Design a protein with these regions (language model features):
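Juxtamembrane/disordered regions of integral membrane proteins
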Residues: 2-161
Length: 161
């Protein structure tokens, strides 16, 4: 076996294994949490857009969704070990969310730059306070959701690792 090749669990009772439907449910829950984060932020700042509240909220959330899904997948947030015990739920969620918050802010700033002037992207347009608030908010919201899912899955399926 090649030591650099990732090990894919072959049996359902491996601690790394998650059924496909559960990956889908957790990913969907993550996306809903991030859309809720964007909706709360837009409401707090009374942001409106010509595309309407739903499309505007999804457009605001999209960079954060991409950042979270990529980092959570890369850091093991969608494996069986990401949901038990609670210390591991917290560790894997916070590890990815602390990186996804700043990356989401950066992606959002890049997306909002005029497409013809992307070369003129300026770092000084990103407020450090927004990075901090977004990162903490995303981390807390995702942690609450993932801890709730972790507890629910253990109640429904006690045989899970």
């Amino acid at each position: 076996m090649d030591p650099e090749q990732p090990v894919k669990p072959s049996k359902p009772h491996s601690p790394e294994w998650l059924p496909t439907w559960e990956i889908f449910v957790v990913g969907l829950g993550d996306v809903i949490v991030l859309i809720l984060f964007a909706a709360i932020g837009r409401a707090q700042h009374q942001v409106t857009s010509s595309s309407g509240p739903v499309v505007g909220t999804i457009n605001t959330a999209f960079p954060f969704i991409i950042a979270w899904l990529v980092l959570a997948a890369a850091l093991g947030g969608f494996s069986g070990k990401a949901f038990y015990p609670l210390s591991r739920v917290a560790l894997r969620t916070l590890r990815a969310s602390v990186l996804a918050g700043p990356l989401g802010v950066l992606l959002r700033a890049a997306v909002e730059a005029a497409p013809t002037q992307f070369y003129a992207f300026r770092w000084d347009t990103i407020q450090p306070s927004f990075i901090l608030v977004a990162t903490v908010s995303i981390s807390v919201m995702l942690l609450v959701w993932r801890v709730a899912w972790s507890r629910a899955r253990r109640l429904w399926w006690p045989e899970l690792p």
